[in-house]
């Protein structure tokens, strides 16, 4: 057990998505008398450090806590995503649902997955706001701000990436359906995601003036957007999981390419609760899903089975942190670990490769010489485009 931990939590958030995951926990922590702080500095010196990124450096935290910012996080690396996101460098890990709990338990035989104190099944804190009065008020505000007619059904388009003019494909797909189309794009910024920022801006310009089309501010919390909709359309975005948490049917388009590699790849979404279709069937499928209540029933059954802690994650998380601060016994939500065993050769190679990447990142961001080399590399890369 850790000794003499002060009631001070620093949330290390590198973007708005991570911050939205942390905010319910921060509110619960404040309610319990903790001092809280938000920072983008991955190397911040902390009493209690709360981490959600793909790249984490918790060495400067007296007590380090890690969780997921995305229910589909690193899905290309399942079932052992911990070979590239090491949890053994943390004290505590938090799991959002039954499936993640089972996946972690099965991977707990590998050292890279095992935090020093343990892993706990707590729930997904980002979804806690669904049960708040603030949530209802925010949705009313959005309806008023955009002038949305709530008597019409709404389709939400929220992709992980905008590519190949698919926003215009969505507008075309719904134009004869007598529905609203709500558009919620990823909050790309010109400095971090310049290409996506440019593409999204161009799509928004081409969408101006289209009837029954509402382009939401990209910083809008996804749960607010989902609350206004009756069905979600995406490809492999985490919004597909988040829609499920609100009992909203989801449509995953299987031939919308994802440009996170070159050449762009087909999307991956490993869950059966989504209706998976090619883009040519969009209009027909949206119409069918909106008229058939069985889709909602199926989603709700899945949610009830896998997310029993919905709305209580922040309380569960703070109960665990309180146990350490006040030196109390842990709750029964601690997940049992399997006996340790050696990693397969291929997994060892992934771990070694990731460690090298992390070392380079740390060098580039914690020394003046490293920062100079990193900026020079970025400049040369930009010049030779």
Q: Model-found features: residue ranges?
A:
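Active-site and donor-binding regions of nucleotide-sugar-utilizing enzymes
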Residues: 7-140
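Conserved catalytic-core segment of nucleotide-activated headgroup transferases in glycan assembly
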Residues: 11, 18-28, 122-203, 309-315
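Structural alpha-helical scaffold elements that stabilize or flank donor/cofactor-binding regions
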Residues: 42-43, 83-86, 173, 224-225, ...
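Hydrophobic/aromatic beta-strand patches that form the interior of the parallel beta-sheet core
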Residues: 50, 65-66, 92-94, 120, ...
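A donor-sugar binding/catalytic signature common to diverse glycosyltransferases
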Residues: 62-68, 219-262
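Catalytic binding pocket for nucleotide-activated donors in carbohydrate/polymer assembly enzymes
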Residues: 87-90, 109-116, 238-308
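Nucleotide-activated donor-binding/catalytic signature segment of Leloir-type glycosyltransferases, i.e.
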Residues: 197-218
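C-terminal amphipathic helix plus adjacent low-complexity
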Residues: 283-385
């Amino acid at each position: 057990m850790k000794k003499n931990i002060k009631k001070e939590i620093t949330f290390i958030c590198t973007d708005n998505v991570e911050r939205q995951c942390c905010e319910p926990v921060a509110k619960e922590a404040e309610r319990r008398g903790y001092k809280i702080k938000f920072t983008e500095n991955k190397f911040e010196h902390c009493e209690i450090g709360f981490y959600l990124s793909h790249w984490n450096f918790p060495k400067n935290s007296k007590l380090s806590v890690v969780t997921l910012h995305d229910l589909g996080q690193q899905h290309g690396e399942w079932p052992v995503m911990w070979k590239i996101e090491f949890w053994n460098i943390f004290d505590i890990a938090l799991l959002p649902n039954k499936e993640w709990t089972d996946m972690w338990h099965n991977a707990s035989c590998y050292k890279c997955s095992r935090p020093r104190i343990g892993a706990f099944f707590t729930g997904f804190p980002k979804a806690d706001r669904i049960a708040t009065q603030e949530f209802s008020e925010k949705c009313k505000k959005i309806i008023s701000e955009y002038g949305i007619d709530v008597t019409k059904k709404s389709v939400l388009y929220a992709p992980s990436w905008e590519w190949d003019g698919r926003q215009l494909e969505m507008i075309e797909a719904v134009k004869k359906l007598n529905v609203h189309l709500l558009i919620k794009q990823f909050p790309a910024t010109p400095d971090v995601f310049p290409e996506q920022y440019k593409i999204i801006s161009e799509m928004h310009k081409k969408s101006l003036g289209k009837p029954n089309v509402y382009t939401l501010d990209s910083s809008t919390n996804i749960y607010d957007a989902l609350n206004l909709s009756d069905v979600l359309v995406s490809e492999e975005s985490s919004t597909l999981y988040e829609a499920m948490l609100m009992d909203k049917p989801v449509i995953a388009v299987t031939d919308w390419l994802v440009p996170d590699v070159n050449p762009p790849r087909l999307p991956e979404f490993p869950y059966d609760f989504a209706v998976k279709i090619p883009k040519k069937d969009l209009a027909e499928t949206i119409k069918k899903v909106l008229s058939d209540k069985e889709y909602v029933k199926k989603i709700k059954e899945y949610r009830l089975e896998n997310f029993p802690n919905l709305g209580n994650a922040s309380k569960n998380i703070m109960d665990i942190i309180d146990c350490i601060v006040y030196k109390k016994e842990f709750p029964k939500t601690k997940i049992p670990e399997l006996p340790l065993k050696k990693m397969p050769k291929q997994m060892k190679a992934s771990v070694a490769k990731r460690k090298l990447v992390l070392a380079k990142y740390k060098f580039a961001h914690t020394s003046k010489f490293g920062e100079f080399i990193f900026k020079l590399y970025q400049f040369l890369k930009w010049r030779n485009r």
